[in-house]
Amino acid sequence: MDIAVWIVSGLLAVAYLAAGLMKTFIAKEKLVKNLPWTEDYSAGTVRFIGIAELLGAIGLIAPWLTGIAPILTPLAAVGLVIVQALAIRTHIRRHEQVIANIVLLVLALFVAATRFLQLAGTI
């Protein structure tokens, strides 16, 4: 189980690192072309989402890997579940596809549940 959760955590971290860097450092006007939902939000909100994704990506790996405050890893995963739940809401409202968001949500939920159970010593 530990190998599976590390693989999923790594894949999520890479995905959120890429998405977070893009939303944090690319101007909103350029993002609208590939991320049309950004036209519904201010540049500050898009940047905030990007920073949340960057912190989530780091939080999925660093605390558990270093053993420093490992509780932050499942909490980061829960934060990413919330990000995806809100993204799903936005995409449904805009009549856009949500499959990728659902997959990311389920994977983050898997990491959160597994890491919480590992901290509790039940698995």
Residue ranges and their predicted role:
Residues 1-123:
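Membrane-interface extramembranous regions
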